[in-house]
Amino acid sequence: LEGANLAPEELIELLAPLLSTPPIFIGILLLVALLIPMIEEAFKTLGVWLLKGRGISPAEGFVAGMFSGAGFALVEGLLNSATVASSTSTDWLGFVVGRLGGTLLHIFNGGLLGWAMANAWQGKKPAKVVGIYFLTVLLHGIWNGLAILELSPQFIASGNLTYIFLAVYALILLVAFVLFSRKVERQAAGSTN
């Protein structure tokens, strides 16, 4: 395999016997849907921490977190683009759905954590940061778990079912993002009156 430039479909076909083994698939799922989100969500909003002593409002924390999430999504998108560009894959639908949903996820999760941190810094329920962190890990883990389903032999046979799941989940995230953004906006307007 050294120097091989395999498309994701070719790699999946090559690894299918291993992936059909439940312990291996569960191990991959735990890594991708739990460990990676825990690490990414812990480090994604490091930029917001630089604002700790500045007395930012929860709305400002939300915006700073969204910027941190957008920066993270940009770097991740560039790395994923390089991977797709160097493969023989023609799966642009999967790439586009993955990047759109992934970008929304990173921006929303960054905003949630930034909002929670700013609330905590104002002395309002510091434990909320831990709860929001675990919520963002859950949201991220669901996204990654859905994305990894395409490696499951049962889902390989189902065609574009993974993309449908990802698109529906991205739509749910979009609705949650809009609703939460409106909540933050109302809170900010109420605190300035």
Spans of model-derived segments:
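Hydrophobic alpha-helical segments at protein termini of multi-pass membrane proteins
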Residues: L1-N193
